[in-house]
Every structure is written in structure tokens, then in C-alpha cells.
């Protein structure tokens, strides 16, 4: 899951070296993926009306469902 979000984020932003992705297990069935990008790239990650962020959350949810865990994406 972490690798997927990192790949997508680095493909979108102008400063790919500033992308940081961490994964935390809240409990047995919940994973929180935290995405940190440069301030200049936050607009690109969120997208117009949040479409890019929502698409990333949807992909993360699909992968999580396959693995049997609930997921959450936090953009910092």
C-alpha cells in the first residue's frame, strides 16, 4: 500500500524527492497511510475539487479490501 501511494505521488509532484510516505497500523484491521509532500505540491496532490486525493483513497481502499484491512490516507 505504501509503495502504491509513493509511486502515484512521485509521478504527480514537481519535487519527488520531498515525498515521504509512512504506514501505521492503528489496530489489527486498520492501516493509516500518511503522505507528506512539499507545500508547493499540495495542490497537485489534492487536485481540483479533491479529485486526485479521492482517486488515491479509492485505490488504497481497493488494495486494503484485498488484504482484509481498512485504510485511511492522510495528506500532511
Language-model-detected regions and their locations in the chain:
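Glycine-centered tight-turn and secondary-structure capping sites
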Residues: 46-50
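RNA-contacting regions in translation and RNA-metabolism proteins
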Residues: 1-42, 55-76
